[in-house]
Amino acid sequence: MRKFKATIAVVGLLAAVAIDTVKAAEKIVFPAPGGQQTVLSVHGATDLSAMEPLIRDFQTLAPNVTIEYSEYVTNDLFDGTSRECNERQGTMDLVLSSSVDQLVKLVNDGCGTNYRSPLTLRLPSWTRWRDEIFGFTFEPAVIVFNRDLVPPEDVPRTRVELLNLLRSKPEKYSGKIGSYDIAQSGIGYLFASYDARGTAILGRLLEAFGRADLVVKCCSSDLLADLSTGRLAIGYNLIGSYAVGAQRRGAHIGIVIPRDYTIVLSRAAFIPRSTRNPATAFWFLDYLLSDQGQKKGREASFFFSFEGTLPEEVDGPLWLSTSGLLRPITIGPELLAVQDRAKRQRLLSEWHRSTQPDGNVP
């Protein structure tokens, strides 16, 4: 189990120098069921378990399309896409990521392709930008807990309740609280940056995380695995869709919508300007936005929807979209500030200073 303090020694280096290599992505090939006529190369920071139902459903409409799906962590996807853009290579036809601030930067740097259709135009305004980035999911950040380790009276439903729990029962929950490593996880950093917006309690919560010896991981799958096995008791700011998926696969976890405010993102897609197969990329994008694609995503992949009710497994208001709790991450130029290097370093330093008061601040 890699703990938060293990990242302190390397964060300054990671923030100060460029990464020369991108970790190899895991590529899965979905052969064309009707015989291959073309190949679509999709690169995503989205779990294969979420993408596979959508890919196979799309192939019922496009049986002659072979789809190659390459899965990354968010920062590696950003680095690889940026490199292809700068070098004008063409191995990526469609890019999907929950770290929408990174996609905004790529589009702002001229890496995207313009596309407009009746399906893109009907999207909520906060989920699209410049006809180049398109959000296709509705995913809240949630609190997840292990049902065997956290009794009902301890389940936190607000950040104040989580703070008070860590203060009142430090021995019980020391080393048992997990969240994203914001130095490695693009979505973790994005969620933290939104937590920092006008949230007076954030500093106290981070200090409590430090006293509780916060455990950090790069990825949702690692955090959910530790929550399922009992290595962790509570996970903070996890992507709700992945948590529901883990629970439906048998993980003995509970899922809570925070009642003070709920950050919600729309996982987004964009088509690189160097795509070799724009027509099929546009087709797959329209599928993701279509009624059929949205229905399949709600049933098999992401479980939440823009207008629907909460999944029955989730503790929260039935109609989340009208609950008044939402703090949506608007896809647009304001996200460029999240990628500003100086602001990023300040947030990383504040995070580490608060959680490691006796350690070195990068």
Q: Model regions: which residues?
A:
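Periplasmic-binding protein-like
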Residues: 125, 138-139, 205-210, 248-273
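Extracytoplasmic ligand-binding site segments that recognize negatively charged/polar headgroups
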Residues: 45, 49-52, 90-91, 97-228
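Mature extracytoplasmic/periplasmic domains
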Residues: 272-331
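Conserved C-terminal helix/tail region of periplasmic/extracytoplasmic solute-binding proteins
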Residues: 328-362
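Early extracytoplasmic/lumenal segment of secretory-pathway proteins
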Residues: 24-104
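A ligand-binding cleft/hinge motif common to bilobed small-molecule-binding domains
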Residues: 101-105, 228, 232-252
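A bilobed periplasmic-binding-protein/Venus flytrap-type ligand-binding module shared by bacterial periplasmic
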Residues: 142-149, 191-193, 265-277, 296-297
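Paired acidic/hydrophobic, glycine-rich loop segments that form the ligand-binding mouth/hinge
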Residues: 88-97, 216, 233-238, 254-255
